[in-house]
Every structure is written in C-alpha cells, then in structure tokens.
C-alpha cells in the first residue's frame, strides 16, 4: 500500500508556535511558506507531490492549501518535513 503524507504550510511556518502546529525548529522554520515551493522541494527530494490549493488546515480559518506527498514510505514524516524545510532554505538563497 502506498504511503501518503500531508505537509501543511504551518508545519514549516516561522510565525506558528510548536504548540500551534509547527514541526521544525525555529531555526529551520520558513517565513510564509507557500504550497508551490513546498511541492517543488518535495519533488527535488525525490517524491511525488500533489498540491491542493482549496483546502484549509483544521486549526486555521483561512485557506492555505496542502501538499500530499506520495511514496515517502522510506522516511518518517518528521524526516520528510525537516528535509523540505532545508530544501526551501536552499531555494530561497
């Protein structure tokens, strides 16, 4: 069975606290992460990414979108989110 992980922008957002859903350290967090750059990072890491723009995180009122990562059964979700954050930092340099 194929593994699907969901990466919400708030997992990487520097303005969100850990208790509100950020999953990376503040040092690794991204200012205003976009689903398009998350999807690009996921693809560069080597997984398939599907963007859903019209979906809101259950804790958020606004629509922020999400990225569905397919085929990431060789790593934990935490490792995946950390790798995405690191790659977005490289993209923004």
UniProtKB/Swiss-Prot annotation:
Subcellular location: Cytoplasm
Domain of life: Archaea
Family annotation (InterPro entries): Signal_recog_particle_SRP19 (IPR002778), SRP19 (IPR053394), SRP19-like_sf (IPR036521), SRP19_arc-type (IPR022938)
Regions crossing the membrane: none
GO CC term (a single one): signal recognition particle
Main localization category: cytoplasm
GO molecular function: 7S RNA binding
SUPFAM superfamilies recorded: SRP19
Sorted UniProt keywords: Cytoplasm, Ribonucleoprotein, RNA-binding, Signal recognition particle
Pfam families reported for this sequence: SRP19
Keyword Transferase: no
Alphabetical GO biological process terms: SRP-dependent cotranslational protein targeting to membrane, signal sequence recognition
HAMAP family the UniProt entry points to: SRP19
Family note: Belongs to the SRP19 family.
Assembly description: Part of the signal recognition particle protein translocation system, which is composed of SRP and FtsY. Archaeal SRP consists of a 7S RNA molecule of 300 nucleotides and two protein subunits: SRP54 and SRP19.
Function description: Involved in targeting and insertion of nascent membrane proteins into the cytoplasmic membrane. Binds directly to 7S RNA and mediates binding of the 54 kDa subunit of the SRP.
Protein name: Signal recognition particle 19 kDa protein
Source organism: Haloquadratum walsbyi (strain DSM 16790 / HBSQ001)
